């Protein structure tokens, strides 16, 4: 499961942002997950719940926004938004398409707090 390595990198990125902002607690992590990212949302959530236990994200809620696949057809010039992993143009059924969005997983926002250490 590559979701474990993805979550490990995500938590590391969260920790870097928290340190840069002098926060010692992250309460929410918002990500955008593309349909073609190759990441399974349920497995990602399970991995996050497992890995967050040791560290600054231990109380964090993971919020995922699923980004549909956006393609441009190079034959009929139609732009389409798809919710399935397909690069076929729904208008003309051409495979001659270009992916515009929906391939990535992005950290969109963090909700952080500064707590007293006493």
Swiss-Prot record:
Keyword Nucleotide-binding: no
Keyword Zinc: yes
One matching Pfam family: HypA
Residues bound to Ni(2+): 2
GO molecular function: nickel cation binding; zinc ion binding
Record GO biological process: protein maturation; protein modification process
Keywords linked to the UniProt accession: Metal-binding, Nickel, Zinc
UniProt xrefs under InterPro entries: HypA/HybF (IPR000688), Multihaem_cyt_sf (IPR036280)
Binding site for Zn(2+): 73, 76, 89, 92
Highest taxon in the source lineage: Bacteria
Transmembrane segments: none
Family the entry assigns: Belongs to the HypA/HybF family.
Free-text function comment from the UniProt entry: Involved in the maturation of [NiFe] hydrogenases. Required for nickel insertion into the metal center of the hydrogenase.
Name of the featured protein: Hydrogenase maturation factor HypA
Organism: Shewanella sp. (strain MR-7)
Gene that this polypeptide is encoded by: hypA
